[in-house]
Amino acid sequence: SEFLKLKYGFDLPAYTFEEIQSNHIEIARSIKQLLESPLPYFQEFLSYGSYPFFNEGLEEYSYRLQQILNFIIDYDLPEAKDISVSTQNKLKKLLYVISELVPFTPNVSKLATQIETTRPILLEMLHILEEARLIRNLRSATKGISLMNKPEKILLSNANLVKSLSEKGWNSGNIRETFALDQLQNAGLTITHPSKGDFLLNEEVLLEIGGKNKALTQVAHHENHFVFSDELEIGWGKQIPLYLLGFLY
C-alpha cells in the first residue's frame, strides 16, 4: 500500500492478517473499486516496489539494486566480520544461485559444491546473508534455529532482488513465495516451514502459495488453512488473492 501511495497517490488502508483472512472478499472489492484492476500494480510492485528509489527512474532501478548488494557485501560485511575477497565473491555467486532456485528444500551439499565451498562454510554464509537482510532462511518449527541446522527453504529478501539477479529468468513460484514471506515477516508474524504446505503462521495457520488454479488439496488436512493465489482479483472462501498480503501491517 505504501508503493501505491508514493507512486500513484492512492491512499489505501493497511490490515492485520486476521482482518484479511476474515474479510478478504470485502477488502478486495474495495481495492478493486479504486484501482479497477489491482493485478498490473501488483506486477509493478514485484519488479520495482520494494525500495523508494523507483521514483528516480525505472531504467536505473536494477542497476541501483546491484550497487546496493555490492556495497553491502564489499564494504558493510567486511567491517562487521572477517571476510576475504574470495568469500565476498562466493556470497555474490550464492545470491545468484538462490535467485534461480525453484522453491523446495535445498540440497545444501550440492549448493556448497556449486559455490565451491564446504557444507559448514555454506551454512555460515547463509547465516551471514540472512543477518545482512539479503535472504530469508525458513526453518522447520520442530528442528529449532541453529547455525548447523540447514534451512528448509532459502529465499531472497524480496521479489525485486529475484527479478534483478536471476539471469536465466525467474521461477514464478519463487517470486510468489518470496513476496509472501517478505510481507508476512515484515508484518511481524512468525513463519516456519510445515511438513505440508508452504508456510506455517504462528504455529497454527497453514498457508499455501500458488497460481489462481491452486487447489486446497495440500493444506485441506489442516483445520486452519488458507491458499493465497496469484492472478486472482477477488477470492472466495479460503482462497485469497496473493496481492492482499501487500496491505499487511
What are the functions of these language-model segments?
Residues 1-88:
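Interdomain motor-coupling "hinge/lid" segment immediately C-terminal to the ATP-binding subdomain
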Residues 4-7, 139, 166, 210:
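Short, flexible helix/strand-to-coil boundary loops that buttress conserved ligand/catalytic motifs
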Residues 34, 43, 145-146, 217:
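Short secondary-structure boundary/capping segments
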Residues 53-195:
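Accessory nucleic acid-recognition modules appended to NTPase machines
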Residues 116, 186-189, 202-205, 219-226:
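Short glycine/proline-enriched coil/turn segments at helix->beta-strand junctions
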Residues 184, 199-215:
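Conserved catalytic cores of phosphodiester-cleaving nucleases, focusing on short active-site segments
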Residues 193-196, 210-249:
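Catalytic cores of nucleic-acid endonucleases
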